């Protein structure tokens, strides 16, 4: 989208990006197949310009503004392209970044509740990386939407990587995850052994 980041959220809320959004929605509708979309994901992290975790001190974006922008974007696009499904995707919580502050409520569209998070070392497990945040997103949403792991990866060079594939899917399955989106690139690109384990366990 056009424009610098600080006024960008305000521009979205004000409707100044509606032409761009409408063009996208028209293209998505013409595509005619299901499309999974998110908007300004990982909003509770500190690495994107739409970070709203400190009440706007760093980026000028507050949780309330982020929600207003989400609701505007999702409502506009969904009215034109009902084939677009929306994934609300905060990052796993990392101190002071509670997801509940960013739940859009009933003012916009949420089709799936997602959670982004990566395994970082041999000691990473679903229980110590995802579980508490999973419970929080379910609480924030009231269990109103299906859950998915919206973005994840496991370091391919980790000697424990194949086991961690099993751990990831073993944790996601009881959580009722309908999908696990794996970022198969860079340091997280799967080895043949990881691919085989993923396919076998996912089945």
Residue ranges and their predicted role:
Residues 44-49, 94-97, 122, 156-157, ...:
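Short catalytic/ligand-binding loop motif for oxyanion handling, primarily in non-cytosolic enzymes
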């Amino acid at each position: 989208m056009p424009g610098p980041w600080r006024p960008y959220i305000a521009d979205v809320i004000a409707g100044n990006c509606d032409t761009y959004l409408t063009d996208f929605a028209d293209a998505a509708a013409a595509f005619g197949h299901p499309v999974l979309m998110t908007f300004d994901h990982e909003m509770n992290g500190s690495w994107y310009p739409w970070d709203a975790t400190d009440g706007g001190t760093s980026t000028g974006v507050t949780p309330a503004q982020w929600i207003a922008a989400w609701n505007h974007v999702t409502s506009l696009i969904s009215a034109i392209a009902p084939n677009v499904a929306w994934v609300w995707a905060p990052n796993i919580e990392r101190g002071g970044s509670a997801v509940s502050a960013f739940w859009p409520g009933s003012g916009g569209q949420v089709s799936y509740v997602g959670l982004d998070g990566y395994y970082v070392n041999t000691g990473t497990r679903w229980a110590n990386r995802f579980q508490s945040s999973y419970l929080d997103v379910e609480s924030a949403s009231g269990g109103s939407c299906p859950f998915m792991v919206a973005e994840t990866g496991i370091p391919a060079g980790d000697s424990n990587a194949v086991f961690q594939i099993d751990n990831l899917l073993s944790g996601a399955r009881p959580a009722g995850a309908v999908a696990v989106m794996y970022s198969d690139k860079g340091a997280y690109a799967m080895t043949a052994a990881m691919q085989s384990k993923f396919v076998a366990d996912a089945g």
